[in-house]
């Protein structure tokens, strides 16, 4: 198979998320965990981006003037707040239904986001480049992780960043992020995650490094049931985020 014939799309995953599209903006619906997760990942994105681009994280629009890609944007839970930080955001998703929901919500909220029903490879082939690429809770749903990461890396400008958040492929993650989250706590619909599609950090880092990027940060993300909040942690056995930079 030639590289041009490759695809990052797992159509079954696209169809499953399309079927739930109307629930994206319900904080008590099927995407409740993402609503809970949003504050910690937004703070991480803001702080690391400001550190890299010499911005003030306390300013009202700290990402002003930066072009950001939110790949696999879903209903726009991340795209909208990043746009509110001043960034020029392209929200990309292969699901027309997701893009429809995201576009409608952004318009109603008065937020400007360039939503497109397009794949990562479609954007890369068009020569699109960005200061920041957000790859959050997506890699565990794609068809070819290595090709997906390589494709996303191509779109990172010199001096730019790529953020990745996903679930580690460990027995601890299988117990907590799949069995407990889907079957006991019912945080997620059954079948949201499949163990064999979870991704270890090195499986993300290798194609990024091979694409000329440098891994600059890794962090775990853990849920505190007492505070009912997600926090950064040293434990990367379940949820984790990593950051890579293309040298100038």
UniProtKB/Swiss-Prot annotation:
Pfam families named among the record's database cross-references: Methyltransf_23 (PF13489)
Q: Which reaction does it catalyse?
A: a 3-demethylubiquinol + S-adenosyl-L-methionine = a ubiquinol + S-adenosyl-L-homocysteine + H(+); a 3-(all-trans-polyprenyl)benzene-1,2-diol + S-adenosyl-L-methionine = a 2-methoxy-6-(all-trans-polyprenyl)phenol + S-adenosyl-L-homocysteine + H(+)
Q: What pathway is this protein a component of?
A: Cofactor biosynthesis; ubiquinone biosynthesis
Specify which residues bind S-adenosyl-L-methionine according to the UniProt entry for this protein: 41, 72, 93, 136
Cite the CDD domains for this sequence.
Answer: AdoMet_MTases
Q: Which UniProt keywords apply?
A: Methyltransferase, S-adenosyl-L-methionine, Transferase, Ubiquinone biosynthesis
Entry's Gene Ontology molecular function annotations? 2-polyprenyl-6-hydroxyphenol methylase activity; 3-demethylubiquinol 3-O-methyltransferase activity; polyprenyldihydroxybenzoate methyltransferase activity
What function is annotated for this protein? Answer: O-methyltransferase that catalyzes the 2 O-methylation steps in the ubiquinone biosynthetic pathway.
Identify its protein family.
Answer: Belongs to the methyltransferase superfamily. UbiG/COQ3 family.
Q: What is this protein called?
A: Ubiquinone biosynthesis O-methyltransferase
Q: Which organism is it from?
A: Rhizobium johnstonii (strain DSM 114642 / LMG 32736 / 3841) (Rhizobium leguminosarum bv. viciae)
State the taxonomy lineage: Bacteria, Pseudomonadati, Pseudomonadota, Alphaproteobacteria, Hyphomicrobiales
- Primary gene name: ubiG
